[in-house]
C-alpha cells in the first residue's frame, strides 16, 4: 500500500482507501469530488486524488495546527522541505516546536505547520500533545528520529503539491463547512464524516467533541 500522507495520525484510515475507491466505482462517482470535514492525516483523500479516482478533494480541519500544516505544504512547499532538511532532530528542537503549539492562535502559518509536522513525526503515535519517541532522556528502544525519514517525507509533500489546483482547503467548523458547500457541489460528490474519537478524543487531538456537542 502506497503511503501518501506525511502525517502519522491516531485513527488514520489509510488502510481502507481501497474501500473508498470501490465505493466511487459502485456509485458512478469516478472523477467526482471527495469532501472530508475532519481531514486529519488525509490518507483517504490523497489516495483518491493521486490515483485518479476523485478529480477534486475538499479537505477541512477546525484545528489551526492541522490547517497550518496543509496550507504550508500546498503554498510554501519549497520552504517547508527546506525546514525538513535543515532543522535538527533533537530534544532542544522538540521543545522549541512544542512552544509554538502553545501559542498556535497567533503563530505564523508556516512556523505552526512545520511545528505540527515535526511533533507528529517525533511524538509517540503521532499525537501532538504526546510524549517524544524515546523519552526526554532518549533512552528508549526507538529514538526521536525513528519516524522521521526526511527524504521520503519530502517526496510525499512534493507529490501532494503537484495536485494543489485540485485541493480545496478550509479551516471551519464541520457544520459550517457543510452549510457553505451544500448548494455548490456537483452531483457526483461524496462526504466522509469521521469525527474525532469521542471518549478518548481529549487525549489524542487538539480539537474534540464533548457532551455539550
Where are these regions (language model features)?
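A short acidic (Asp/Glu
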Residues: 45-48, 69, 180-181, 201-205
